[in-house]
């Protein structure tokens, strides 16, 4: 019984760690799309390439987190 509870807790923790990443990725992808489609409309960002780079870094962070969780911690 204790083993089953530990497995359930493990699955819950992995799920909790994985859950926010897809939404964050979509949010930052949307920001990049805004920069690409309407660069003149973004007045507070004079360096569009730098702003896009920041968004790409954020996408990479969440993508990498999912890759690590899936590669090292999810059961096969």
Question: Predicted regions span which residues?
Answer:
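Extended, charge-rich alpha-helical interface modules
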Residues: 2-76
């Amino acid at each position: 019984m204790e083993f089953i509870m530990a497995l359930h807790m493990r699955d819950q923790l992995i799920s909790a760690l994985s859950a926010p990443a897809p939404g964050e990725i979509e949010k930052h992808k949307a920001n990049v799309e805004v920069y690409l489609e309407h660069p003149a409309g973004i007045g507070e960002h004079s360096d569009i390439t730098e702003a896009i780079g920041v968004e790409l870094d954020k996408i990479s962070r969440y993508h990498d987190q999912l890759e690590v969780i899936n590669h090292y911690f999810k059961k096969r």
